[in-house]
């Protein structure tokens, strides 16, 4: 996936600001090929590999497909996520393209729900429904294009982030079951994640 760990002394400018293109946290979502649109419970069809600031990696069961076929699928690309409210209710990670202030992610096709748009807006990383339900319920879809995390470990997941967090996110759409890390020289004392076209898998 192109994750590369950069020594901390090479990661900040003279003002102590993280250099452009570098992230202290990142998430890679796998694709294990088990998602079934007819299944109401698809948590575990993806794994979220969370790269932490301390150099450790933790994993969470996840789902990166929407609850119904008439909602868009975020393509395999690098996006950014920031800490914010999901539907005004609880804190989650709000995804968007780089430099976008409207929580939009450009798609590679027309949005099936809104055919006049080639983007998805308001896609978050949030917890799954009750008992890890991932389908369409009485109040609508659990995911209208969002990424879902195991509800039983949600507090642990979101606890790794805060209002200052700026997180790099990429989801596999090519059946990649775990991060390749082919250009990674991983050392536990190296804390910064830099991406080099992570969606181009060698």
Indicate where each model-derived feature is located:
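Cell wall/extracellular polymer interaction/catalysis modules
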Residues: 1-140, 154-202
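Short Cys/His-based metal-binding microdomains
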Residues: 149-150
């Amino acid at each position: 996936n192109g994750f590369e760990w950069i020594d901390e002394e090479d990661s900040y400018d003279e003002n102590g600001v993280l250099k452009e293109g570098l992230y202290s946290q990142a998430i890679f979502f796998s694709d294990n090929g088990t998602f079934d649109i007819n299944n109401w419970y698809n948590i575990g069809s993806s794994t979220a590999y969370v790269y932490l600031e301390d150099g450790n990696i933790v994993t969470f069961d996840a789902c990166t497909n929407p609850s119904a076929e008439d909602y868009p699928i975020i393509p395999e690309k690098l996006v950014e996520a920031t800490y914010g409210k999901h539907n005004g209710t609880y804190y989650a990670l709000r995804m968007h393209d780089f430099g976008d202030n409207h929580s939009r992610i450009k798609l590679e096709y027309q949005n099936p729900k809104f055919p006049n748009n080639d983007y998805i807006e308001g896609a978050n990383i949030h917890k799954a429904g009750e008992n890890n339900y991932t389908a369409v319920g009485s109040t609508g879809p659990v995911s209208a294009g969002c990424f879902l995390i195991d509800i039983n470990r949600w507090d642990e997941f979101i606890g790794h982030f805060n209002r200052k967090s700026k997180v790099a996110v990429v989801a596999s759409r090519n059946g990649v079951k775990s991060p390749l890390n082919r250009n990674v020289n991983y050392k536990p004392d190296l804390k910064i994640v830099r991406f080099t076209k992570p969606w181009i898998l060698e």
